Amino acid sequence: MPLLPALMLAAALAQNAAPPPSAEPEDKAVLAVAQAFFDGMEKASPEAMRATVLPNAQFMGVRKQADGTVKLSRVAFEDSFGKHMDPGVKEWMWSPVIIRRGVLATVTAPYEVSKDGKTLHCGIDVFTLAKADGAWKIASISWTAEPDACPELRKL
């Protein structure tokens, strides 16, 4: 392969590549908490999810309606996932971006959620975590719910 086309191809692929996973131990710890929340969700275990969140953790979902309006749903963990979790739900994320400063961190990533193996929707998750008593805990999770965005988001 001639050198110029190979370099152009490499440059194009690099522009779309996700950032490499962080090697920082604190970043890994932050990401592990978000993953533990997903693991608790998959186990349908409010107790396992509760172990990852701060008291009074808040959740917010954002969904664009068919008429173009935006629906915001806000709920406390204890009033939603903390009460009951349906079995068969699985959520996963990829290409996470972690920003951490002191005792505050965020994890932003595309995600997909399914129930009994069927995709419900994709979107962007934003976890906000705080370090309390030496451990990272989720203070809030915000997300978009975009049923038609999965093909686009899976490319990220």
Residue spans for each PLM region:
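Sec-dependent signal peptide recognition
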Residues: 1-9, 129
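Short beta-strand edge/turn micro-motifs at domain boundaries
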Residues: 106, 122-149
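Sec/Tat-exported extracytoplasmic proteins
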Residues: 34-45, 53-57, 61, 81, ...
